[in-house]
Swiss-Prot record:
Gene3D superfamilies: 1.10.20.140, P-loop containing nucleotide triphosphate hydrolases. Residues 35-38 are annotated as: Interaction with substrate tRNA. One of its GO terms (molecular function) is ATP binding. It is an enzyme of class 2 (transferase). This is tRNA dimethylallyltransferase. The gene is miaA.
C-alpha cells in the first residue's frame, strides 16, 4: 500500500513555509523539513529555519537533529524521512515535506535501495545517465528506450511519467532482468503530490535580496562567525550559502559589503538551479502565490482531488 505524501518545493523566499502551515492545519498534517542544512542546531538564520512562533502547534521533523560537525548524507536523509513519514502516518496525519535539496527529495520519492557506497555511486550514475538522455532527446525517446528493452513494462507506464520510466530502465540495468518480471518495491512506497511555488524572476531576486538584508540584521554574520570559529568550510555544515561567503571577510580578504553581495549572488544562482532541477526532474504542479494569492484555492482543490 502506497503512502500519500505532500511535497512542497520551490526556491527560497516564495512562501513555502506559510503554505505548509496552512495545509497542515487544514488537512491534519505534520511537517518534515526537506532541507539538508536545517538538520543542524544553532544554524537558524542562514538556513531560514522556521521559528517556534511560526510552527504554532504543528509538529515538525528533521530540524535541529545534528551538531554542525556531523555529516548528513542522502542515505541519512532517506532513512530519517522514512521513519518520520511512518510515525506521522501512524498518528493518522498527512506527511508534508517542505522545501529542500532536489536530489535528496528525488532519491526518497524514486525509491533508491540504500546500500552504502554502492547506492551512492552506481545508482546515482545510472539515474543521471537516463536523466541526461531525457533532457537531450525528450520523454518519448526515453520511453522508446524502455519499450526496446521491456515492452510489457513500457505499455504499463505513461510516457509522461518519466520518473517511473527512468526507474524501470535503472532496474533493468542493475539486475539484468525485465522490469515487468520484478516486484519493484519503490512503486508501492510513496504516492507524492508535488506542489511548486515560484514567481517571476525579477520579483524572486528582489525577495531574495531583501531576505538576505533581513538575515544580516538578525544575526547572520554572527552565525557565520560561529561556524568559522569551529572550522568553517572544513565542517559538514560549513559550506552552506550564507556562511561560506563570510570566511574571506573574517580573514581580512574582502569587505563586509562584498561578502553580503556574494551571499545575495549565490542565493540567486542557487534559486535558479533549484528551479531547473525541479522542472526537469520532478512532476511538479506550479503556483505563484506571491502575485496570485487567491491560487491557494486551486492548491486546496488539487489536494482534495488527490486525497
Amino acid at each position: 500500500m502506497t503512502q500519500k505524501v505532500i511535497v512542497i518545493v520551490g526556491p527560497t523566499a516564495v512562501g513555502k513555509t506559510a503554505l505548509s502551515i496552512d495545509i497542515a492545519k487544514k488537512y491534519k498534517g505534520q511537517i518534515i523539513s526537506g532541507d539538508s542544512m536545517q538538520v543542524y542546531r544553532n544554524l537558524d538564520i542562514g538556513t531560514a529555519k522556521i521559528t517556534p512562533d511560526e510552527m504554532g502547534d504543528i509538529k515538525h521533523y528533521m530540524i535541529d537533529i545534528l551538531q554542525v560537525q556531523q555529516r548528513f548524507s542522502v542515505a541519512d536523509f532517506i532513512d530519517n524521512c522514512r521513519k518520520d513519514i511512518k510515525e506521522i502516518a501512524n498518528d493518522d496525519n498527512i506527511p508534508i515535506i517542505v522545501g529542500g535539496t532536489g536530489f535528496y527529495l528525488q532519491a526518497l520519492l524514486d525509491g533508491y535501495s540504500l546500500g552504502g557506497d554502492t547506492f551512492d555511486q552506481l545508482s546515482i550514475e545510472r539515474r543521471k545517465k537516463w536523466q541526461l538522455f531525457m533532457e537531450k532527446n525528450g520523454k518519448e525517446k526515453l520511453w522508446e528506450e524502455l519499450a526496446k528493452l521491456d515492452i510489457v513494462a513500457a505499455r504499463k507506464i505513461p510516457i509522461n511519467n518519466f520518473r517511473r520510466v527512468i526507474r524501470a530502465l535503472e532496474v533493468i540495468e542493475q539486475t539484468g532482468r525485465l522490469f515487468s518480471e520484478q516486484h519493484d518495491e519503490s512503486n508501492e512506497e510513496f504516492e507524492p503530490l508535488l506542489i511548486g511555488l515560484n514567481t517571476q524572476r525579477s520579483t524572486l531576486y528582489e525577495r531574495i535580496n531583501k531576505r538576505v538584508d533581513i538575515m544580516i540584521q538578525t544575526g547572520l554574520i554572527e552565525e557565520a562567525k560561529y561556524l568559522y570559529n569551529l572550522g568553517g568550510a572544513t565542517l559538514p555544515a560549513g559550506k552552506g550559502i550564507g556562511y561560506k561567503e563570510f570566511y574571506p571577510y573574517f580573514d581580512g580578504e574582502i569587505s563586509k559589503d562584498e561578502a553580503i553581495e556574494l551571499v545575495k549572488r549565490n542565493s540567486r544562482r542557487y534559486a535558479k538551479r533549484q528551479l531547473t532541477w525541479f522542472r526537469n526532474k520532478m512532476n511538479v504542479v506550479w503556483f505563484d502565490l506571491v502575485n496570485n494569492p487567491e491560487d491557494i484555492k486551486k492548491i486546496y482543490k488539487l489536494i482534495d482531488d488527490w486525497i
